[in-house]
Amino acid sequence: MALIQTAFIWVAYAVAVGIVALIAAIFAYTYQTPRDRSALVSTITIITLTSLLATVLLLPVDIALVSSTTSSKLGAKKDWATPETVRNILLTLKIVYYALYSLDAVLCLLVIPFTYFFYEEYDEVDTEEGTQTLGQRLLGAAKYTLFFVVLVVILFLVGFFAPVARGGGSDMDLDYFKRLLAENHGERALTFALGLLISLGTLLYILYTSVGLALLPMSFIKSAPSISAPQLSETTASALEQNRERQRQLEGRNVGRNAGLSAKDQRELEALHREERTLVRRERLAAEARGEGKSFIVKAWTKTCAIFRPLKLVGGILLLLLSVIIWASMLITGIDKAKNSFCKQHCGYILGSINIFQPLNWVFVKSSIVFPIDYVLMALLVLFLFSSSVTGIAVIGLRFLWVRLFEIRKGHTSPQALLMATVMLTLIILAINYSIAMIIAPQYAIYGAQTFCTNPTRFPGDQPDCSNHPELIKTCSELSSGEGAEKVCTPTVVSTFLNRVTVNFPFFGALAFWAQFVFLAIFLIVFVTALFRTPKLDLSELDEDAEADEEEGLLATTGRRFGATWQDIRGKAKNQTPSRGAAGRGIRGDDDHDDD
């Protein structure tokens, strides 16, 4: 039975990793610009994001395996859960964690920089002329990557020799905290490196994830009030007819004149030609949005999406509620830790036990009794925070101070920007891993649903029996003491690893903890601002994208959607007569106003 349960947990994890690999592939394909698509960049991006998400999704596996050794109803270890069996489970988890964390660090600090410089070394002209070889590109990329190799070596040397906290005081004499003080120099180096990467990721996390967490639900609820495809087609056709009629008037007015068009008429005609090109592109966008020239399946899918698009509002409201619950849960845990942590900044504000009801932690603890309910919930939470981070990066962009270096947009992200965004997501996901385990669901992440029996034993070595005394069953926590707690309560590997970072290097723990309050403040500011801000349709951006795609012969293949209305479903525009002057001025204003 134990073997079947363990196998089921690992199979569920393998399925989850397969799903996140698919999500990573969709992310890389969706955001990378088609005309500069690189197979190497896409592959590295997919591998990196899969490894990172697999690291975070190992948390519920860790909890499920550790909790499976205990009967929460009796507060005792199961018969098959001998000390040797438990040690083997923890050793397996530790090996997987070390492998994933090491892979994450290597990908972030070495592989991605090498890929970035390798792509930058490519010169199309030199390659076609045969003056640039693959070996030259590899050598050039390796030369620039050498700096990062030196950085990694220095990082691990500092961690290898860095002094760790010894934690004076009675509070740190508990067995749980003694085990956290790493004596192995190799573990200490990896702990220091992880703590530094988490700290760097936390700085990005409080900026990008907080903004995305507030704006992602709003993007579902308050979509840009853009025109439907049929309405855009009709309005554009009317404006195009007016434009061409005006061109005919100008040309007819100057027929027979030896001097040709006057300077004023010539400027107006040139402006009309530019406007005409813009209107033609918009017509094509509207036609593709309606599925014209596509197969029956594509047209049916377009209309189906139009029918179900109002469900975005319901989904947005649910995501908004989830965002508020996450914010409230983080605030509750932060206040609880700041007030009731027995070691404060000396151990990164480790909380001995939950003193204030925390909704998300309660949901996860209760659902962990029946696997894989908690696993599904945790996977959804991780993907939501990941999507929020992507949204934040897309909104803010890749910046140095106030200067935007790269833009992250669907179908318009360069390979260099995609690699830089992947590095940022790498660091952010490490910070998300800390936040979930230490702030969002602290009790669940450390002990899951484990309990222990406080009933005295009948003789030394016997297991306490609470079958007739359920009131003596207590929840496991860091401060749990006594023979029953020592034998039954087994902390998860990830909590031990993260707490080891904060106990051995308290600065990292204090930084990660207080940064959560900055995260909450930024979320609140952006959330309140988004409530009162009305999104607007940026037609100039549509025109620029269409023009760029047209130059490459790739005119808007994704078919931008313009709002779920009855017009999209019927494929017809509303019967209305737009003002001639307003239509002409409105569209011309999107192009060049300076030429009039």
Swiss-Prot record:
Stated role: Probable lysosomal cobalamin transporter. Required to export cobalamin from lysosomes allowing its conversion to cofactors.
Identification of the protein by name: Probable lysosomal cobalamin transporter
Transmembrane annotation, as ranges: 7-27, 46-66, 95-115, 145-165, 196-216, 313-333, 350-370, 376-396, 420-440, 507-527
Biased composition (Basic and acidic residues): 587-596
InterPro entries named among the record's database cross-references: LMBD1_LysCbl_Transport, LMBR1-like_membr_prot
Keywords: Cobalamin, Cobalt, Lysosome, Membrane, Transmembrane, Transmembrane helix, Transport
PANTHER family per record: LYSOSOMAL COBALAMIN TRANSPORT ESCORT PROTEIN LMBD1, LYSOSOMAL COBALAMIN TRANSPORTER-RELATED
Major location category of this protein: membrane
Membrane topology: Multi-pass membrane protein
Intracellular or extracellular location(s): Lysosome membrane
Entry keyword annotation includes Transport: yes
Family that this chain belongs to: Belongs to the LIMR family. LMBRD1 subfamily.
Gene Ontology terms describing biological process: protein localization to vacuole
UniProt region (Disordered), positions on chain: 566-596
Keyword DNA repair: no
Any one GO MF annotation of this record: cobalamin binding
GO annotation, cellular component aspect: vacuolar membrane
